[in-house]
Amino acid sequence: MTGAVASVNIKESLGDRPITNVSAALQGVVPGLKIESTTGTPGDDMTYNIRGTTSINGGEPLVLVNNVPMDINMIDPQDIESVSILKDAASAAIYGARAAFGVILITTKQGKKDMAPRFNYNNNFSFSKASELPQKASPLESVLAYKEMGWANDTYVDGKNITQWEGYIRDYQANPSNYPNGYIFDDQGNLFLMRENDMFADMMDNFGFMQNHSFSVSGGSQRTSYRLSLGYTGEDGILVTDKDKFDRINMSSFLSVDVNKWLTTQLDIRYANSTQNKVEQGGRNGVWGSAMHLPSYHNILPYEQDGIEYPAETSATFVRYGEPRVIKKTNLRTLGRVIISPLKGLKITGEYTYNRITEYNRMYVNKYKYIGFNFTGLLNNVENSRYALTQGFTNYNAINAFANYDFSIGKHDISIMGGYNQEESHKESQ
C-alpha cells in the first residue's frame, strides 16, 4: 500500500460526545476529511469529501464495512473497532474506480476467544441549541433603508408612506403602550407594522434533545468467539411541535468458529431500522428561507377575522400546521465468510454478502388557512391537499474470493495476493 493513509482512534473520537451516527464521530478528527451537514435535520445524511470540492466531480469516498460497501449511517458507533482513511487515488488500484475519491475502511468489533461473557452498556443524553442565527435589520433600520432607496413619492410597494411609517415606529419605540398589537391602520386603511419580532425564536424550541443507548455482550471459548449488540438512538430537533425527529434501532451479531486447524467459518448479521420525520418546506421560500427573508417587523401573532382567529403567515405556522414527511428505512446485511489455510503461509478467504434495503417515503400536504402578510385576507397554503407515497427496495449480492501467500527466500519476505469480486444490485420502487 502506497499513498496517504490515516487511522482514527475511535475511543478518543467517541469519548463522551453526543453523536447519532458515525459521520458525526469522524467529523473534525481526520485532517483532509471534510464532513458537512447541509440541513441540520435530525437523521439527514452528511456529505463526505477527502480532496476538496475542486477535485474532479467532487466525488465522495467509498465506504467499506468489513470489506463490503454499506451505508455508514446505519452502524452504531459503539460497534466500531477501527477506522482507516485512504486519501489518495492510489487506493483505486485495489478497490477499483469507485475508490478514486478515497476509501473509508471500517472494522467492527468482534468477540475474543477464551473469554468469559462480558457485558457492556453505554448511554449519553444531550441537548442542542442553535448557536448562530442571522441578524436582521430592525424595523426602523429597514424603513430608513427604504427611504434611502428613493421610492417614488416616498411610497412603499403596498402604498404606505415611508416617512409616515418612520414616524409611527419612532412613536412606538417611545410609547409602546399606545400600540398594544404592534401595528396600526391609518385613515386610508394602510397597515403599518412596528414591533420587532424574532422569526427564528418563534419557530424553534429552547432546546433539542438527543439520547443514545448501546448494550453488548461478547466472549468466546477455545474455538469460538461471539458478540451481540443492540443500540438505540433518538433525536428530537429544535423546531416547535417536535415534528423534526429521528429514531433508529441497531442490532448486530457476530460468530466465528474454528472448525479445525485449517478451516474457520464466520457469520456477521447486521440490522438497522430507522424512522425520520422532517418538516416539509412551506411558504414562499421554505421554512428556513421564509424565516430568513421575512423582515423583522413581519407580524407573528394570530389575527381574528369574522370571529375566527387565524395564524399569521410565518415559518412557525408552516411547522405547526403542516404534516411532516415520514421516511422509514430498514437495512439487513448478512455476511458469511470461510477462511481456509491449507498450507503454511497460504490463506484463502471466501465471502458472500446479501444486503436488503427497504424504504418507505410518505409526503402529505394538508390544507390549512392563515392570514396574509398585510392582513389582506385568508390564504390557503395549497389549493388542494396532496399525498404521495413511495416504497421501494434494493437487493445487493456480492462475492469476494481472495488469497494471500506469504513466504521468504533468503533475506527477502515476499507476499502475493490475488482476488475476485462480483457484485449485483437490483432496485425497484413505486
Predicted segments with their positions:
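Catalytic cores of large soluble enzymes that bind and process phosphate-bearing ligands
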Residues: L14, P18, D205, F209, ...
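Residue-level signature of outer-membrane beta-barrel architecture
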Residues: T108, G219-S221, V257-D258, I269, ...
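Short secondary-structure capping/turn segments at boundaries of alpha-helices and beta-strands
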Residues: A93, S214-F215, L335-R337, R356, ...
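Short, small/polar-rich motifs associated with maturation and membrane association
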Residues: M1-S252, T264-Q266
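Surface-exposed loop/interface segments of Gram-negative outer-membrane beta-barrel transport/assembly proteins
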Residues: K113-E196, T233, G237-R333, T349-Q430
